[in-house]
């Protein structure tokens, strides 16, 4: 911070209460095992509930050799984790995406690209975390504490309050039993509705991670980029799902501390029923606005 005024990026695996003020955290030297993939979800949710929201696991596992199937499923968890990082030890099979077969590479690319498209949603959640302490990756019990079905639910999680992710965590499975809490939920891609307070068996072939959006939910996305900074983020696309809802979107330059001096924008989106668009109100204008805001 003293040298170039840009926000620092620090990563550690040894931490204590309060570390979240200084560093992101990863969960240590895991192994390329399905059991360790299953552990990743409660580990990251527990860290978030303990105040350490910016955390992740070694995608694919650090020790031993990762299989193509395990890598595909781990990437589907990592893409929604606050810290998304593939990492492995010397002596294990190389885990770069291109070291795998073409099918695995295609699936890996799909979820990395989805991550890039979801950056404005994730950024909003980090902003919310800074203001309130709410984690980015959340156990369902955080928002549905009166629903006993969520008390010991470790196979799915929320990203913010609007997006529910239910990854496959068992070897060889191509279907997923998903619990949806109260309300109506919509498939992220197809917008097919599901009534809550019940379990569903949904298809989940190797290239699919079940995702659901809460009724009235809105998910901001950017146009696909291959890396941050490849193109200007001047167009915001807002995915709208049926139901009444509001959404606060935050925008700044993503690089320095100018936001502390007011160099940021806040947009309040309001949506009702089955409308295809939402109204937009500028709550705060201190930065370059988007050229386009699109709805889908």
Feature-to-residue mapping (PLM):
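Catalytic-domain carbohydrate-binding cleft regions of carbohydrate-active enzymes
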Residues: 1-207, 214
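Accessory, solvent-exposed terminal regions and/or long lumenal/extracellular loops of proteins
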Residues: 208-296
């Amino acid at each position: 911070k003293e040298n170039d005024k840009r926000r620092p990026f620090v990563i550690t695996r040894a931490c204590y209460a309060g570390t979240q003020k200084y560093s992101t955290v990863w969960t240590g030297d895991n192994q390329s095992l399905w059991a360790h993939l299953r552990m990743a979800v409660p580990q990251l949710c527990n860290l978030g509930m303990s105040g350490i929201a910016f955390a992740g696991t070694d995608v694919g596992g650090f020790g031993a050799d990762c299989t193509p199937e395990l890598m595909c499923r781990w990437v589907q968890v990592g893409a929604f984790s606050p810290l998304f990082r593939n990492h492995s030890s010397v002596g294990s099979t190389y885990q770069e995406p291109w070291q795998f077969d073409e099918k695995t590479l295609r699936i890996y690319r799909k979820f990395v690209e989805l991550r890039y498209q979801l950056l404005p949603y994730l950024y909003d959640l980090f902003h919310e975390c800074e203001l309130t302490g709410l984690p980015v990756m959340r156990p369902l019990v955080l928002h549905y504490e009166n629903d006993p079905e969520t008390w010991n639910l470790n196979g799915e999680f929320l990203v913010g309050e609007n997006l529910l992710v239910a990854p496959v965590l068992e070897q060889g499975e191509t279907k997923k039993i998903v619990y949806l809490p109260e309300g109506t939920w919509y498939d992220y891609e197809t917008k097919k509705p599901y009534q809550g307070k019940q379990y569903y068996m949904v298809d989940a072939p190797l290239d699919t991670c079940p995702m659901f959006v809460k009724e009235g939910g809105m998910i901001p996305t950017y146009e696909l980029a291959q890396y941050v900074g490849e193109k200007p983020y001047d167009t915001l696309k807002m995915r709208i799902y049926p139901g009444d809802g509001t959404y606060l979107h935050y925008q700044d330059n993503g690089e320095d501390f100018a936001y502390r001096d007011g160099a940021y924008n806040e947009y309040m989106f309001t949506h009702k029923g089955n409308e295809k668009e939402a109204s937009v109100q500028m709550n705060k204008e201190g930065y370059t606005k988007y050229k386009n805001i699109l709805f889908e």
